[in-house]
């Protein structure tokens, strides 16, 4: 039995590898905007869990005897749920809005095994630093935050601009290792079952 990661995220892969797991990588290609639109103002935690499940669903037919994991993260800032900024301009706009504020990074998890699902969401509070306009511009131009939920990464250049985290730091990187462990336990599996 293997652990299949329905993601192309190098950060999620890195977390699993650092945790002793050699995941099977099966990047999921879903229309996130269409999934969100179909939810009709669902609560933020439901939105990220539904996106995580949609990603995992793309891999279960190919891996019917394995554990399939899907994840999705979005930033809840001032009541708005924000995904990836995609452009330098949008990244700059978001950083100017979020600097000096607290926000919640929501990471939804959907784990499938043996025809059953376990879904849950982790909320971690991020305190963004009072970042200068010059640093915001330089960070956006680096390209690092363009494809990251909330327009930031905890690792790499983004580490300069996060003043504090309250909650699970691995969820901020994209996959809560403690939550994944609890999901595996619900299936009667252990984390160590997947160690290489």
State where each predicted segment sits.
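N-terminal beta1-alpha1 ligand-phosphate binding loop
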Residues: 1-21
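A local structural micro-motif
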Residues: 23-24, 192
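Active-site-proximal loop->helix
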Residues: 18, 37-38
């Amino acid at each position: 039995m293997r652990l299949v990661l329905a993601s192309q995220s190098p950060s999620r892969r890195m977390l699993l590898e650092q945790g002793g797991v050699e995941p099977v990588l099966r990047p999921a290609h879903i229309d996130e905007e269409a999934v969100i639109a179909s939810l009709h103002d669902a609560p933020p935690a439901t939105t990220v869990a539904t996106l995580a499940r949609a990603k995992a669903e793309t891999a279960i037919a190919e891996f019917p005897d394995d554990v399939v994991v899907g994840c999705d993260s979005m930033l809840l800032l001032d009541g708005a749920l924000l995904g990836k900024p995609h452009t330098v301009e949008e990244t700059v706009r978001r950083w100017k809005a979020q600097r000096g504020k607290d926000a919640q990074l929501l990471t939804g998890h959907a784990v499938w095994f043996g025809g059953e699902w376990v879904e849950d969401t982790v909320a971690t509070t991020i305190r963004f630093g009072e970042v200068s306009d010059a640093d915001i511009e330089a960070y956006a131009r680096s390209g690092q935050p363009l494809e990251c939920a909330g327009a930031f990464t905890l690792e790499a250049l983004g580490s300069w601009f996060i003043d504090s985290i309250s909650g699970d730091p691995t969820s901020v990187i994209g996959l809560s290792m403690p939550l994944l462990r609890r999901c595996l336990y619900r299936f009667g599996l252990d984390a160590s079952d997947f160690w290489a």
